[in-house]
Amino acid sequence: MAKISVMGTGSWGTALAILLHNNGHQVMLWSAHPEKAASLNQTREDPKKLPGIKIPDGIVITGDEKTALDSPDIVVFASPSAYMRAISKRLSPLIRRGQIIVNVAKGVEENTLMPVCDIIKEEIPQADVCVLSGPSHAEEVSRGLPTTCVVSA
């Protein structure tokens, strides 16, 4: 069982947190917005992003990045690509050397056209970064439907 922190409570981050939890991992889900973390903790559902999908009680939800990054084996970056540089800068001091970061955000940075994984590598040089991508949808993953993804470093 791995300790995994998913950084981002959008549909993709939440769906992956549920999948990882259902596969026996210890999962923490972090929101950059403490009020959203509090709401998700109370309702255990995000009706705007994943209506009808319950977040299992075993997933810890926090709005505190220090708590989320205290000791995970793997960190999943699931924030939108438009915010990835700011999130990476914010979290960089809390990421240890050799920490595994799995980027699941798609796209490029608007002003530089840099792929998201390159932004993370630039802002968090002490981490080992890989990318998970494929033809999948958060709604399907959250319901446990089959999908295909690959990881590349």
Description of each model-found segment:
Residues 1-51, 60-63, 90:
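NAD(P)+-binding Rossmann beta1-loop-alpha1 motif at the extreme N-terminus of oxidoreductases
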Residues 28, 56, 104, 108:
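Conserved short-loop catalytic and cofactor-binding motifs
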Residues 29, 151-152:
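Short, hydrophobic beta-strand segments that form beta-sheet elements in well-ordered domains
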Residues 35, 44-50, 54-56, 103, ...:
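Residue-level signal for pocket-adjacent positions within structured domains
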Residues 51-60, 125-127:
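A short helix-to-beta-strand connector/capping loop
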Residues 62-70, 74-146, 153:
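Rossmann-like NAD(P)(H) cofactor-binding subdomain of soluble oxidoreductases
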